[in-house]
Amino acid sequence: SWMNKIDLGENPSSQDLLDHLHTIHNRYTGFTEKIATSCCDLSGKNSYELLIDTVDPNSHTDILDLACGSGVLLEYCNKLFPFNFKLSGVDMNDNELKLARSRLSNQDIDFYNAKAQKLNFIKDASKDVIFCHWALTLMDPLVPVLKTIKRILKNQGIFSAIVDGDLHSATGYLEIHNIIYKFVQKIFPNYGLLELGDPRVRSLKTLDELVKKIFYDCEINITPHVLSFKQTPEVLAKEVSGFFYASLVLSSKHYEILVSELSDYFDKTSVDGFSEFNLPVNRLVVKKTSKICSLKK
């Protein structure tokens, strides 16, 4: 398994990563929801809403959410956009899709169980908007995913994604990251030496270079954002620890110890009983603009 190979200091394969992601998502289905809906920028927008801002309701009507998870983003779309919008979601995890289907059970939304690299059932140039919320970071291999997105995106279509931001750009984030990783490394010494997925997504510069290679002649914008969540130290510690994949490999006993360590950290930084968690993200927006862009493969 992925964890065994990490433990032995070996390099896990793409299949090991997939198996590991399935294990985590089966055990903690919907785990990113709470923190992602709660963390907001200064104008009160969370990361789902930052993606929705990239839609032009006058010219876009067909939206695909790639790695849609438990369906939160599609639920936002369903509430915001008129009934003539065509919404669909793809995810590789059955349990997440079950949650998404039950959340949107009365709606005319298509869900597909598939990997992002294998979307042969979606026609060329058929989607106005493709969203990917917090999942590009975990896709391996990533280049086939980007090529697929380019293939199925219409001319004038938009591809928008939320990915990890710079660790140093949000106050306190690095400290929290380090508390979690140091704790996990006491039990799994090699954990964190190898990141999940493609490391190029984790830096603005390398992400920009990678996307430009695939989407040449398209408009590409990557913007950094810091999203914040205020809560009591205990609540914040629980929510924040569950947002990091690293902490989800722990046994329940160790997990509780980690949560109490985080709670102590938030306690020290609290003001009037409330602490803050600041989350750095990058928003990638690609607009498929030119004829050349859509014709070249």
Locate the predicted segments by residue.
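Conserved catalytic/acceptor-binding region of the Class I
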Residues: 143, 158-227
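Short glycine-centered segments of the SAM/dcSAM-binding site in methyltransferase folds
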Residues: 62, 157-158
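Conserved class I S-adenosyl-L-methionine
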Residues: 2-57, 72-76, 96-99
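A short acidic, Gly/Pro-enriched loop at the edge of an enzyme's catalytic core
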Residues: 121-130
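A short SAM/SAH-binding and catalytic strip from SAM-dependent methyltransferases
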Residues: 129-142
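Conserved Class I S-adenosyl-L-methionine
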Residues: 2, 6-10, 40-43, 197-210, ...
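Class I SAM-dependent methyltransferase SAM/SAH-binding core
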Residues: 64-66, 70-119
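A short glycine-rich, Lys/Arg-flanked "PGG" loop and its adjoining helix->strand segment in the class I
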Residues: 143-155
